[in-house]
């Protein structure tokens, strides 16, 4: 198994990450990887025993705004795999944003409304650009439900917590999601760059590490 840094020490997380690395080593194809990870990921989502209280809190200083927290739970030594908990306060909506990585996203606590967008010029985003955006669908997610990300085809969305408690979604993504420079979009399709950051780990400051 490849090395990495764990920010939670609970056994279910260690077991899950071991399974993830085993799948990645056996399957170079992303579709096969996702298919093989569905069952262990579902089990992690359904186990309510392992996420410590400190990783269920909001973050007033979030890079996404609105008190949204991004708690890093595990990161590979090469920073090409991250498991994190996104905590969105009640009534708060994330910016429309992308992820720039394949992976799995599922709801662990609360309820979310997810709105996915199709972006026409998905290969060449620059700050200040205006891109054509069409809403693909709007759906409600409940605990245990999850979906796959496969950029660029379904990589742009926003979520809103519609439960009385904060929503917590678990993300398993193939990049250093909190520290890479990503894109967000306003309601008109105007593009801006942002870095969401991690609530429990600083990002490198050098420009070479930002992309």
Describe the role of every protein-language-model region.
Residues 1-50:
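N-terminal leader/capping segments at the start of a protein or of a new domain
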Residues 62-90:
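A short glycine-rich, His/Asp/Glu-containing loop-to-beta-strand
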Residues 101-120:
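Glycine- and acidic-residue-biased ligand/ion/polar-headgroup-sensing regions
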Residues 104-106, 164-179:
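A short hydrophobic beta-strand segment most commonly corresponding to one strand
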Residues 118-156, 195-199:
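Short acidic-glycine-tyrosine-enriched beta hairpin
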Residues 151-170:
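Ligand-binding loop in jelly-roll beta-barrel domains
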Residues 185-211:
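Long hydrophobic alpha-helical segments typical of transmembrane helices together
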């Amino acid at each position: 198994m490849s090395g990495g840094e764990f920010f939670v020490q609970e056994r279910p997380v260690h077991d899950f990450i071991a399974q993830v690395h085993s799948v990645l080593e056996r399957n170079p194809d992303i579709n096969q990887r996702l298919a093989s990870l569905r069952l262990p990921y579902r089990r992690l989502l359904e186990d309510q025993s392992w996420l410590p209280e400190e990783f269920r809190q909001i973050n007033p200083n979030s890079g996404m705004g609105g008190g949204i927290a991004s708690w890093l739970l595990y990161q590979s030594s090469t920073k090409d795999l991250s498991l994190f908990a996104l905590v969105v306060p009640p009534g708060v909506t994330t910016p429309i944003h992308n992820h720039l990585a394949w992976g799995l996203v599922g709801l662990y606590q609360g309820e979310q409304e997810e709105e996915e967008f199709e972006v026409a010029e998905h290969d060449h985003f620059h700050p200040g650009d205006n891109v054509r955006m069409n809403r693909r669908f709007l759906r409600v997610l409940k605990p245990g439900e999850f979906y796959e990300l496969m950029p660029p085809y379904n990589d742009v969305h926003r979520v809103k917590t519609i439960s009385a408690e904060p929503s917590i979604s678990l993300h398993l993504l193939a990049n250093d999601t909190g520290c890479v420079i990503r894109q967000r979009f306003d309601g008109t399709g105007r593009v801006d760059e942002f870095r969401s950051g991690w609530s429990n780990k600083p990002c490198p400051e050098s420009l070479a590490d930002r992309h």
